[in-house]
A protein has these predicted regions:
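Solvent-exposed beta-strand/loop surfaces, strongest in extracytoplasmic domains of secreted
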Residues: 1-215
């Protein structure tokens, strides 16, 4: 093994019967075992923002049969969308090897979410109700939240008005960049006012003119 190096090299002469004919000087030499080169190639990985990290795996080239690689890879810290380098971490094959590490990246991709404005409306002349929305696909991660307000196109005449995204934003500590946000507009409808007219009962004497009808 490398740890046991250097080893002493000595010579044995034969046949032993002829040694008396020589004046022999013994000079020793060292036999050194150098570490074997081992290539560890990290596998590229990816995940969606907010999900746990996948297992970090690798491919080994040059390992002697029976020997093992222990320890684990690590990646650079961070949970926002982007690429993070995978490093050798605690990987080791022992003192008999020198590791050449080929790095890779763990890529965090955006989290998809769909927000739809709820359809709403009012009677002409009334104040606008609060505009609301629903998450129809996907979800928020961690303690992320949504803030801001929807808006509708201006107008007070009878008809339909689009409800738009307005100032709605996702608070994720990264300017909302950790999400792939799809916004679906809603419809705000201004309707006619319903007017009920109730006629008052009336009567007359036969042959007389009709009275004035009231309501």
């Amino acid at each position: 093994t490398v740890a046991g190096s250097p080893y002493t090299i000595s010579a044995v002469l034969s046949p032993t019967g002829v040694l008396a004919n020589y004046d022999i000087t013994y000079n020793t030499a060292n036999f050194t075992i150098t570490p074997k080169l081992l290539t560890v190639t990290a596998d590229a990985k990816s995940k969606i923002y907010g999900l746990p990290d996948p297992a970090l795996t690798y491919v080994v080239t040059g390992l002697v049969p029976g020997d093992v690689v222990s320890g684990s890879l690590i990646r650079l810290p961070g949970e926002n969308v982007g690429s993070y380098g995978i490093t050798v971490g605690t990987l080791s094959a022992g003192s008999n090897y020198t590791i050449t590490f080929v790095p890779a990246d763990l890529t965090i991709n955006k989290r998809a979410i769909t927000i739809k404005a709820d359809n709403n409306g009012k009677i002409i002349g009334d104040p606008d109700p609060a505009l609301t929305y629903s998450i129809t696909s996907g979800s928020l991660a961690y303690v992320d939240s949504i803030s801001g307000a929807l808006v509708r196109d201006a107008g007070e005449d009878i008809g339909d008005y689009p409800i738009r995204k307005g100032t709605l934003v996702i608070n994720d500590g990264n300017g909302g960049l950790n999400y792939e946000l799809t916004f679906v507009e809603g419809v705000f409808t201004i309707r006619q006012m319903l007017l009920t007219v109730t006629a008052n009962p009336a009567s007359k004497v036969y042959g007389a003119a009709d009275p004035v009808f009231t309501y």
